């Protein structure tokens, strides 16, 4: 399918062929008929992308500070590479479209194939021939609402939410400052609600257009005098600021024309240097509106389909969409007069020449249109023929996110005996980009395409944590060797299913516990190779803060941070000691509403009496180095600092080794390739993979028990038994 993409490195907006996305549970596949170009949000993205690195840095000093911290922690070269990897990722543009449902994922009751819908949301309602959209961002369309009107639904909801925040009443006087698309929708919504409306703009053409829609409208120069006449010198009850300008004038003007104790709502991107004197004297209320309404930026609402109770939240973003569509159906919200340009998707780049001013012509509503007669659906884009040359590993990859692009695929690309066959991502876009960048034969949006491809003998699973176990089982059943990024599973039921499959399988599997393969880790292990006493290993992790709403913090999706990432450090200690833990005790600092059991101290015991301690901490400073390992055993001490420096002490003799940070990604893949080529054992024993994963589960459970007297016995505890899992 065709999709408009923004290159964040060079600023070019281009139309590319990408695999058609596939709907997962709670999502619908929509064949798009029309999509609206946002002259505000999308122009801002394009203009940012077009700037050079210095220009980008000036606009985002917060990101510059993060890069400086990362450079101090990890070195300049890895930091620059990480920055370019982020800029290299294409961005999908658009957030408001309309079309027809052509396929449904599971749990989509209330929707049907063939249904006409409006679509909303950045990353979902994008400028592409097909969109995959979650249920709460879909709005059914009445027969008398055309697709081109419905493509305005998302923008209409922004205006609607801003208007609702002002708590309007019938008969109140409402001023709308700024008569762009948002303002022209807002004046119609306010009029439909029974308010007396006046629009204000600096552009006489916008003023004339507003007047043609049935409201009084004036130029900025006449705003104060006209406001007094319009309100009989009382001032406006409500002022909606819909302007798009860095100037502070709209905020200042709003205060001048508002009545005493009026409500002012800003929906546009304007200067917010609020003049205290007049706002204080009039006791004005000021609200900065956030997007489409309640539910916005809440993944449980937008992506997981959980609605808010009507009695508690009357106007969610979804119900705002419905309200906008209803006004369109009743003829009270007109969009046709607002459209100045139509472009077919093939010429979408020309639309951005208009909205960025490269093409000097006035514009307002810019629509992209899509051929409805065309119905060529392809989940696969081919770049080249599959090579007939023999390779030990013919690789298919599931997942094309930042980890794949910045870390694993560069490591894989450097290994000779790996041929890159196919790569998949659910949306298709990132698979297409990564497939072309790294030299895969094809890109797809279908996991099954990769798993069932007879040309592929090895599958790398780099998807969301909750999908790992199921994909591992499917790939093993298909006779593939499997590399899966950690964690292996997010719960004991998944882990038991993987364990059973491994017992009945001839293919090899390994997990992305790369740290044990790092060069300095191998030196550290060699230093203790002949030890005869139990070890004490302390692993301190300055993990850094992650917001509570991040997907990794969700136990059902990411597993939480201890299962999702803490397993790395349990595995490293397991590697050094050479056996899986037999008990785990864990304690967490109080969360205090900021954390989610991610300031944790875990104590692990091992069969030979060794003890491992993992301090996983989210409450530190990210500019400080992330990881430090200290090992005490048999009169020897070793300190590993962030996989950059190893210091060993024995009999008073100190030795220090320094090198560029290397956490072992390439070495692990090389070990896996060698095992496949030679038909040997997996690089990490299965009992350790299972044991480490169980230990991460036990640590989370121990935090819940929070009793210093009771550790979790890894062998006998019912959580890790087959009967409990069943």
Language-model segments: which ranges?
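Predominantly a Rossmann-like dinucleotide-binding segment in NAD(P)-dependent oxidoreductases
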Residues: 295-312, 507-508, 515-593, 706
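C-terminal helix-rich "cap/oligomerization" subdomain common to oxidoreductases
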Residues: 354-361, 368-369, 374-386, 458, ...
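Mid-domain Rossmann-like dinucleotide-binding core that forms the NAD(H)/NADP(H) cofactor-binding site
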Residues: 116, 123, 146-222
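Beta-strand-loop-alpha-helix segment that lines the small-molecule cofactor/substrate pocket
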Residues: 259-260, 469-513, 719
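N-terminal Rossmann-like dinucleotide-binding module
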Residues: 376-438
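Contiguous beta-strand/loop segments that form the cofactor/metal-binding neighborhood of enzyme cores
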Residues: 353, 358-372, 377, 564, ...
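Rossmann-fold NAD(P)-binding glycine/threonine-rich loop
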Residues: 268-285, 289, 295, 488-508
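Glycine-rich beta-strand-centered segment in the early N-terminal region that forms part
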Residues: 21-36, 45-122, 677
